[in-house]
């Protein structure tokens, strides 16, 4: 019997190897086609770029967003061609050049001038618009003249976003000697307390962990805080941080404090929050409704029942060499699809809520460094993550609300770049996709599919998926067994302690 099992295993492995070889062959063929297409189009590129630039100017003049204001405050609806026009300190201008910030984005053009004048700001802009630099630049410009500890505090809804905001401050403040620290849940409180005792200029934090330190870390206070920023404020409130925000606002000073509130949307909750925390703010709106950028191509792919895995592998093969985020609805699916991709020799890493903070940052670092071309994620990655070079977003599972769809596809086509999103739509997703199309105000075109390739891939992909599921089940059983063992040891120790009494 064991020989029969081994022969079956060998046959299955051979089939998987064969599939991987076929995929690689197809990938090479696709890459050759891309290279040939680029060569043919090379002579036309200059004229195309000129035409594109002219087209962008026309579109810009037609679609300038109106800038509404709170309490009649206003800022001019103008754009700037360089950061030097904003009258920043030389160190900041040079840092922008070092980061290849060619010119301020619309939200930066609208928000930075009134912020430099000392106004409170409400910034409303779609994802990928450069919101972080829009509040970091005026804070750092003022910090250059003051250089005080605990100068600014930025509140973010997730640990990943907080870490990325810190990276932006560190990069922009690299020539200014700026000290920053990231205070988030899931990390050691004592290590964070030591970082706070070093008196950083900038604190980036999730609300709950900041409140922990305000209440429990001796010597830490924000009584002299000059700037408070609430980034992704709509998300902060969606995640039930409202009561914690109220407590924080009561602790920190209101006199001589400048407050910025940035959000993708303006809701009644946001309006209530800004009334409680801001004074005569200037409202800078680039977009006042759910929408996607013009450089994003959005399509859907109708998937017959039971073939979603095969269609996904088909897409990975068609877009070989591109960076991709695959969004799923569950943590188990994220882990399973990551394993399936890797088994079929597509380099992937997973990002979901079952990973600890170090594992999450490790996955992100692998993806951002180009060591993995595919990130399989739940919606934990959909908001705030600044990964500039994502070519394609795939919705393996359609999100249940339209706002999540907007935030997912906003991971590509960021800061003027082009990008593509593809949604895998089954018969059960029709109502969800109709709602999304209603919000977008347009029908999503269908992606073409080579059905012959789908049929060729189907059996092998199903077998590979079966292997991944078996491996996940095996790991889960081991995890449960380890848990039982620990509980048994704890109960034994408790019984011993009771006997000693």
Swiss-Prot record:
Keyword Phosphoprotein on entry: yes
Q: Where is this motif: DEAD box?
A: 231-234
This protein's superkingdom? Eukaryota
For bias type Basic and acidic residues, the affected ranges are 491-501
Q: Which cysteines are joined by disulfide bonds?
A: none
Q: Which residues carry this modification: Phosphoserine?
A: 43, 45, 47
Disordered: annotated span: 36-79, 480-501
Record InterPro entries: DDX47/Rrp3_DEADc, DEAD/DEAH_box_helicase_dom, DEAD_box_RNA_helicase, Helicase_ATP-bd, Helicase_C-like, P-loop_NTPase, RNA-helicase_DEAD-box_CS, RNA_helicase_DEAD_Q_motif
Instruction: Name the residues that bind ATP.
Output: 125-132
User: Where does the Helicase ATP-binding domain lie?
Assistant: 112-284
Provide the protein's localization: Nucleus
GO CC aspect terms = nucleolus; nucleoplasm; nucleus; small-subunit processome
How is the quaternary structure described? Answer: Interacts with the SSU processome.
Q: Which family does it belong to?
A: Belongs to the DEAD box helicase family. DDX47/RRP3 subfamily.
What function does this protein fulfil?
ATP-dependent rRNA helicase required for pre-ribosomal RNA processing. Involved in the maturation of the 35S-pre-rRNA and to its cleavage to mature 18S rRNA.
Q: Quote the protein name from its UniProt record.
A: ATP-dependent rRNA helicase RRP3
Protein's organism: Saccharomyces cerevisiae (strain ATCC 204508 / S288c) (Baker's yeast)
What is the gene called? RRP3
